[in-house]
């Protein structure tokens, strides 16, 4: 069991690192193109892809951190149930995150809401998912690269804060 747990942790961490590498690489490529002339359409298309990656990253990391939390705290059967019930979580706007977190501990949500950056976290998630859904359904999305980059940074900070809240 210990070997399997170590393997799962390594795989989860590998998924996190892979997402972050892909996102950071794409940010670097777009920054390079921003310094050139006449690449607006390419930057726009890459930004849409970046939006989708950030949404996927958000979903994977939320599940990862919840699984990590109850890894050593729950009975194996309960752990399996919890893991299966959250693994296909999508469209993680703040209301959905709050709803899921309340099922574990309402204090987590109360603490997060007191964070000075809470509204920025919420707005970033809203922007990412509104635009991801527009892109996925063929609608026009005017989200800019800088806005995406800022949202990504805020989402990373949100997860840092969430981990602290869950650990306290």
Regions found by a protein language model. Name each.
Residues 143-168:
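C-terminal structured interaction module
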Residues 71-142, 162-165:
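Flexible secondary-structure boundary motifs
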Residues 13, 17, 41-49, 119-126, ...:
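Short, solvent-exposed segments of well-ordered alpha helices
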